[in-house]
Amino acid sequence: MAANNKKYFLESFSPLGYVKNNFQGNLRSVNWNLVDDEKDLEVWNRIVQNFWLPEKIPVSNDIPSWKKLSKDWQDLITKTFTGLTLLDTIQATIGDICQIDHALTDHEQVIYANFAFMVGVHARSYGTIFSTLCTSEQINAAHEWVVNTESLQKRAKALIPYYTGNDPLKSKVAAALMPGFLLYGGFYLPFYLSSRKQLPNTSDIIRLILRDKVIHNYYSGYKYQRKLEKLPLAKQKEMKAFVFELMYRLIELEKDYLKELYEGFGIVDDAIKFSVYNAGKFLQNLGYDSPFTAAETRIKPEIFAQLSARADENHDFFSGNGSSYVMGVSEETNDDDWNF
């Protein structure tokens, strides 16, 4: 960084830095023409390009498919999505917000503010699915189930102390764990159904959510590694031990939850393997090797195919609100443009 730029940052504060400095000093605005870390600009451009809203997805086209499902399957889907809503509520209101306080750059602060908003959109998306497909009784019962299901509550609460704790690195690990691992057990169900041509538009929403989660996990993993590399080797080893210990603890909580959730539907073992596979991917994103065997992470081909953001989409992406689109750019024309 040039000397003048260093002086600029040393003599001014971001709004959050101003608060931390006991409301002393001069405030600065975020300057996208002076980027400390090019990864910030790259990720910002990607998340803006990927912006979407659930109202643009024709979930109502899934009503015929929904009506063909038994009540047990309908209740399972509703419970699963309500569980995902809880996790996204935590991430939007605590997890990503806490990362603003630990940001390395001004731009990282606003990126996590954007993440928090989009995770709020994800939580709203499940509400869109509910209001389209479910009865009020099903929705209310599912939300009551979330409050009263201990296995779900345990896994949902597990990361909150690290979000709000005093260790920025542990908070960053937790911020990556939610989009990088903890949601995937719930994602398994819509991908399983989509591979069987059921609820295809609902699955499109899940793919859009997944596309965002991949970026959120990647960015948190990248920032974790940038923080970690500045630490002494002993601290790096300590953090690695922490990550693996927390990961294994969460896997056990996830297994307990998935066994309770999916019992009787014939998908428990495959859902667990799907989760463990993504646990390995999460560890790799933090710069560690996956310790899991091929047998522990074997995913059926039809499920693996659903991980593609372009898999079997069902609506018009010209408007730029699908998972395989490129945002259209409009330009006004004049008479001369049509003189061929």
From Swiss-Prot:
Fe cation 1 binds at residues 88, 122. Fe cation 2 binds at residue 216. It comes from the Bacteria. GO terms for biological process: deoxyribonucleotide biosynthetic process. It catalyses: a 2'-deoxyribonucleoside 5'-diphosphate + [thioredoxin]-disulfide + H2O = a ribonucleoside 5'-diphosphate + [thioredoxin]-dithiol. The active site is at 126. It is an enzyme of class 1 (oxidoreductase). Its cofactor is Fe cation. CDD domains: RNRR2. Pfam families: Ribonuc_red_sm (PF00268). GO terms for cellular component: ribonucleoside-diphosphate reductase complex. Its EC number is 1.17.4.1. One of its GO terms (molecular function) is ribonucleoside-diphosphate reductase activity, thioredoxin disulfide as acceptor. Keywords: Deoxyribonucleotide synthesis, Iron, Metal-binding, Oxidoreductase. Binds 2 iron ions per subunit. Tetramer of two alpha and two beta subunits. Belongs to the ribonucleoside diphosphate reductase small chain family. PANTHER family: RIBONUCLEOSIDE-DIPHOSPHATE REDUCTASE SMALL CHAIN, RIBONUCLEOSIDE-DIPHOSPHATE REDUCTASE SUBUNIT M2. Provides the precursors necessary for DNA synthesis. Catalyzes the biosynthesis of deoxyribonucleotides from the corresponding ribonucleotides. This is Ribonucleoside-diphosphate reductase subunit beta. It comes from Mycoplasma genitalium (strain ATCC 33530 / DSM 19775 / NCTC 10195 / G37) (Mycoplasmoides genitalium). The gene is nrdF.
